[in-house]
């Protein structure tokens, strides 16, 4: 960020560039052979493999700290200044509104050509252009030499090589051109030798074209021509750039007509710091690049008379002579400069180089060539753009450009690293040059500020917010003029320093290396957009930076002494860091500030579109830096932006308003000025300047451009030396450059103040600093006392300085440093003494141990003893602590020496005590090694003591033990202690022997596994048992074979195997008689398949045959029992019903379609829960008993539900005329269209209907079922289930027939007959013998049913069978057209509970304890998958089965609360609660 004075300026045309033909030829010089190396290629790695510098610190001020920018910057300065550039992230509540209308904001950006700004590239291009310029205007025909391969010779590289060999003169004298050629040519061409033609080519071209140019430069450097220097400095002053825009246009009073000058064309600029006033050019001067009308001979005789010359007798050419030989002879060889107004002439033989003939083209004298040379390269890389943009259109352009460049759809897809790498590649790219646009240096007074300003008219809904931020201290329009900013004493704004500039950036737009004007601070705020990347060098390293750049580009730095004050040169930070320059980076996001410190070189670029604003400010600590900057500017003859001394005296004038900090700094500077003025007066006296030659002048009333030293360009304020005759002015220091033709007597000394005036000002200002001086004297005395002061007293002085707002002087910082150092040491000591923080944890994977050691503690004690404050108390504590540490170390050393006498626990306790000290103790590491050795010994003994036990195979963990593989043992051996003892050596030997033995047995196991046999398994295992600790492939296979065989035996006899014998054949012969389920047989078969010995054996085939027989039996039974539209599997059909309890409770139990292929595992899966026939018999009898108790409750629940008991759950609404059927067993009512006809119903009286729950199967004839059992294994439990059902059917049929006969004879009641009939109807096998009696009793007992639903039954019978049965019945998810919550889906009431019973054989029914806990007067003892309970909430808190109370779940859930009958008897008032117990 650069600066300009806020003054009037006008738009100006583009700056004149160097002549086009040299630039065109220069481009040829760039197309050299790819094989020819250069300095650029030497530095290539830094550009193509860019490494980002380390990041500078980021600061996050609190809201309180953020309230005062100057104070906060002063607070962080001592830490941050060394980085040059730092970032400040404001508090989250700092959100200034953007005050610019993006559509109305218009600007014309500058175009930046990235490959023209880099220092190394620029140096080469400049050299080539200057060389062409010199040869062209010197009258030489210049062409680029070409080698034999057609490659253009790189003249810049050739020049550098010759210079490295000592220069042209030395190369010529020592005949080193072959060496030069050898250095120039690439290695692959050197194989063919160095061509003599090439040597002659480069020698002749160098001597003819390059050496005269170099000689001209040396002669110019040796000259001490002040007039010429003025001319050069003036020209460069015109072309000072900020991002390529003109820095200033200051006109120095002309003492003479500049030779070789021209009309000054002002450079295009956004705004100017100063404007030249009343500038007049010589009327006789022509435009640069035009030539006078002369004939080809350039003879004096042919020179036309000047226009308007009335003297016909005098030829103007008589005044022309050769400036080299001062003679006018040989007029036909006397050349005259083509620049109008320049009368310099030179003979062809006086030229350097000598011309053989009069050149046909343009010729200029050396002075005019030098003038043209000074312009070359000043404006490279920065050009005026043709298009004007507003913020919206530039945003669109910038984002599209970035997306197109990186080939993405959105700018957010491009990583930050990719942009940075591409930028540094582009600055050296010749093949694909990149140009971008940058809206830089846009003055806010003209285009507007991104911050609201006090003078703006604020409107809109955010009016108050704008007014708030218009006065905010961090508003960049306010920062330069804050009370503690030195710049606040200026009466007028300085553009870029006091008046902010704004910058509209895009991807790759760059700002080159520079420092701020007058080395002030700068602050930059990114209003919105993508990041701005900064690189910074601290002010203390500025000279390192300058030296590095001189090394990188000596041609540029040697040519421009003030190169570092321009903003047109880029240099790679990675390269600079390799040369020892400390550079750090800052990544500035939107909404963040960046601060640059005095003399901090900084540069950077933009990652994409953004809008930033910047301004300078100058805290009081800047004053001394500003003075140093003026001296630096003087050395390079750079113009000032303002007079530093003048600013200081503006502060002196306002001394009554200065704070103590500013008063002190101003007083110190004023004393320096006073002493300097005294010294200058003494110098003048020695020079002979008398008092009569002295004059008091008010310099501030003289325009800046009229009071600058003609030599160093410093704006003068305190004093000046003036030549009365020629009106020239210098500072006193440069009196010898004032005038070459006058003496001291012709000088006049002008001064601003008398010495007495300065002395009085010092006294007056000193009075304002009395309190500080007293504070300083007292603090000095305190530090110089014999006894050291206590830390508390030092803090009192610091607090006093803070309260009185004393400046951050060296004394204050000294006290703060003492306090900080002391507190830091105290904190370290306290961490050791009080164990507040454990800095290293006990983890296996440790980071680097950064803790101190005992030497570090002793060093800390010594540091505390040497400090400038008294820390005796803490030092004494630390010394006593060290004594304890030494005592511990002695104990630790004893434990290490006699480790055998210490247990592992004792050593661990010593380590734990040592860890508590939290310092590095080498004894801890030694103790840990002892622990490691003991741990290793324990691990090794675990292996060596692992012995096989007689019954180890019976251990339930036998299969899952963690054993050791060969690699584990080898690893254990490798981990053995490096310094073994006798004990560890013995363990290593044992491990090695065990491993050898185990590997031998592994071979035996391998042989067995190749030909496994069951009769050999026992003997093989006996030989392998001792390797129980070993885990290898073939021993594992034998071990697992043992385990599988044991499991198979266990499955067969349900006993824990004793593996000393294997009598499997006997067991397998019994398997057909063993009680076993089909699923268990399949499990045994699977186990056989995993056994190497039994898979495919005779025994295995026998089991497979049994399974095949059972599967065939299942198929036969399924054909007999399962209808096509079955909703029950075989077990559910053949077993007693277990769904009665939930049905009695009113629950909905869905049935799912069971049709399709018969899978035995699906048909008998409930059989997995039974392990014996006794369990099945007990289970079936229990269900039968429960059916007798509960079935009446089921009928009651179904009757109450009506059609909700239908398989559609009552959702299939119908007319009252629709036919329904009622099951004669369970009283559930069904729509006819919801029912399916069963052939069994044809055997019953017409109108008789059994529902799908009561008629689960096809009711096959008992003889068919008996036949199906033929050939089945006697021990298969599934066959027992069928046999039991056959036996039950016979008994029920016998009971039915006997009851019917006895009823006829009067010996039996109707109730007994009804029970017998119910049993017969519920039996799933049909015994035809009982059918007549059953039909007779049905017709009699259910006559009403039969008459009522005979037509409905006929309708069902005649209805065609559905082609596609329903997927499920009684399923609310399927049948409901609109979802209605069912009882089973309601949230269980707080007064009810459900006790789940797992369906294991022993827990399938309720325990007696459960029955006893039900307090119903007649408990029905229900059981099943779920039984619901309800609790009395009246006071007794007793529990009851819901079914035992006669309620359904819906009724229970609808109750407010349930009260039992006992509690109701004691109630005093009626209640709505229900009780039926």
Curated annotation (Swiss-Prot):
Disruption phenotype: RNAi-mediated knockdown decreases lifespan in wild type worms with an intact germline. Results in extended lifespan when egg production is inhibited by the addition of floxuridine (FUDR) or in a glp-1 mutant background which lacks a germline. Residues 56-97 form the JmjN domain. It is found in: Nucleus. One of its GO terms (biological process) is regulation of vulval development. Residues 874-926 form a coiled coil. Its main location: nucleus. Its cofactor is Fe(2+). Residues 246-259 have a biased composition (Basic and acidic residues). Keywords: Chromatin regulator, Coiled coil, Dioxygenase, Iron, Metal-binding, Nucleus, Oxidoreductase, Repeat, Transcription, Transcription regulation, Zinc, Zinc-finger. Residues 1-37, 222-314, 1375-1404 are annotated as: Disordered. Belongs to the JARID1 histone demethylase family. This is Lysine-specific demethylase rbr-2.
